[in-house]
UniProtKB/Swiss-Prot annotation:
Entry annotated with the keyword Nucleus: no
Protein's recorded name: DNA damage-inducible transcript 4-like protein
Inducing factors: Up-regulated in soleus muscle atrophied by disuse.
Tissue-level expression: Expressed in heart, skeletal muscle and testis.
UniProt-listed GO biological process terms: negative regulation of signal transduction
Family, as annotated: Belongs to the DDIT4 family.
Alphabetical list of Pfam families matching this protein: RTP801_C (PF07809)
Major site of localization recorded for this protein: cytoplasm
Residues in coiled coil: none
Cytoplasm recorded as keyword: yes
Keywords: Cytoplasm
Cleavable signal peptide: none
Reported function: Inhibits cell growth by regulating the TOR signaling pathway upstream of the TSC1-TSC2 complex and downstream of AKT1.
Length: 193
């Protein structure tokens, strides 16, 4: 609901005349709508819900990385920059805020880019009871100056034998690609962070 104020049609005097003293000060206020002076209070339930949703999304991303480190990445440790998953979760919530079902309609594909090669890590369905309305593709990036390289793991058969002693260092940068599934135009939004 949007409340707007306007001068009543009964009063033909201009605002400048009213302000210059053409009438007494009380009449000016009575001509404007009450809602122009009321500031809406923040809904604390929404703020708490958004923070909880953000933290749940952070946990889902961290679980995805944890599961993938030995099964798909073949390493013993994944070092994640401080607040990276928090920033990603906030961006995901922002991108889902304009969708008909919000985050519930999201399917997220999580990938890792190493030396221009993308490795699929996981697929996260935010709410299986809702038909997806959009897809997000999250691309983590390996730290470019890191001393470890996992290129050998992707192209060799023995990734578990030698790889479990290695550490993967993630960059603080990431890419989010949003694709609307219900749009006839097929709108795609790419954000590089």
């Amino acid at each position: 609901m949007v409340a707007t104020g306007s001068l009543s049609s009964k009063n033909t005097a201009s605002i400048s005349e009213l302000l210059d003293g053409g009438s007494h000060p009380g009449s000016l206020l009575s001509d404007f709508d009450y809602w122009d002076y009321v500031v809406p209070e923040p809904n604390l339930n929404e703020v708490v819900f958004e923070e909880t949703t953000c933290q749940n999304l952070v946990k889902m991303l961290e679980n995805c990385l944890s599961k993938s480190k030995q099964t798909k990445l073949g390493c013993s440790k994944v070092l994640v920059p401080e607040k990276l998953t928090q920033r990603i979760a906030q961006d995901v919530l922002r991108l889902s805020s304009t969708e008909p079902c919000g985050l519930r309609g999201c399917v997220m594909h999580v990938n890792l880019e190493i030396e221009n090669v993308c490795k699929k890590l996981d697929r996260i369905v935010c709410d299986a009871s809702v038909v997806p309305t959009f897809e997000l593709t999250l691309v983590f990036k390996q730290e470019s100056c890191s001393w470890t390289s996992l290129k050998d793991f992707f192209f060799s058969g023995g990734r578990f034998s030698s790889g479990l002693r290695r550490t993967l260092i993630l960059s603080s940068g990431f890419r989010l690609v949003k694709k609307k599934l219900y749009s006839l135009i097929g709108t795609t939004v790419i954000e590089e962070c």
